[in-house]
């Protein structure tokens, strides 16, 4: 029922593949067992599932997940998500990967077109709408950066890669809301850099 087609990318905690699941095109993330930090690998897998029950136009949807995997795969589990393509905001901003918008830009003439004002506003609204929804559900992403914002063929931004996310539970001690996981240092919220409480 699940057939891997081609690799889309890999990161610190696993690899992502384009695949089919019951005939539908999906993305599959296999979270690998880390020999160096098994706890962090496990936390990343379960953090991805913080959004498993959510549905929103600007959040990558989880279709299914499983902790069953052949021993040969060295995998903690598999997460099946909607396929939104392989273009990220990072590709669009920096002209990398499959996206290279040819033309003369306004700054330096390096051959890459700057985002139009309309695109910038639309993308920003999509991201803010997705974040507002996540925060209304008590979920903080903790690794939001251009590489984790996917752009569909229809030009809709979807927030993905929830491996560092946390679900904030009301009534829990504030000390429990301190970030225990990584995330990209250069994109961290100021309160995390100061060692303060995570907030939505």
From Swiss-Prot:
Coiled coil: none annotated. It comes from the Eukaryota. SMART domains: S_TKc (SM00220). ATP binds at residues 8-16, 29. It catalyses: L-seryl-[protein] + ATP = O-phospho-L-seryl-[protein] + ADP + H(+); L-threonyl-[protein] + ATP = O-phospho-L-threonyl-[protein] + ADP + H(+). Residues 2-200 form the Protein kinase domain. The active site is at 143 (proton acceptor). Keywords: ATP-binding, Kinase, Nucleotide-binding, Serine/threonine-protein kinase, Transferase. Its EC number is 2.7.11.1. Disulfide bonds: none annotated. It holds the Pfam family Pkinase. GO terms for molecular function: ATP binding; protein serine kinase activity; protein serine/threonine kinase activity. PANTHER family: SERINE/THREONINE-PROTEIN KINASE TNNI3K-RELATED (PTHR44329), V-MOS MOLONEY MURINE SARCOMA VIRAL ONCO HOMOLOG (PTHR44329:SF285). Belongs to the protein kinase superfamily. Ser/Thr protein kinase family. This is Serine/threonine-protein kinase mos.
């Amino acid at each position: 029922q699940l057939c891997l087609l081609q690799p889309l990318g890999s990161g610190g905690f696993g690899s992502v593949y384009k695949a089919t699941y019951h005939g539908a095109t999906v993305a599959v993330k296999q979270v690998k067992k880390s020999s160096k930090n098994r706890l962090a690998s496990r936390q990343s897998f379960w953090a991805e599932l913080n959004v498993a029950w959510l549905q929103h136009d600007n959040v990558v949807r989880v279709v299914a997940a499983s902790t069953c995997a052949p021993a040969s795969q060295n995998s903690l589990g598999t997460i099946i998500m909607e396929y939104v393509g392989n273009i990220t905001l990072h590709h669009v901003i920096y002209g990398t990967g499959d996206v290279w918008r040819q033309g003369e830009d306004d700054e330096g003439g390096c051959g890459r077109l700057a985002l139009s004002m309309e695109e910038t506003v639309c993308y920003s609204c999509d991201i803010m709408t997705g974040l507002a929804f996540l925060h209304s559900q008590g979920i903080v992403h903790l690794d939001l950066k251009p590489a984790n914002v996917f752009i569909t063929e229809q030009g809709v931004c979807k927030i993905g890669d929830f491996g560092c996310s946390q679900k904030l539970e009301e009534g829990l001690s504030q000390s429990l809301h301190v970030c225990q996981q990584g995330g990209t240092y250069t994109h961290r919220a100021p309160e995390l850099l100061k060692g303060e409480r995570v907030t939505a």
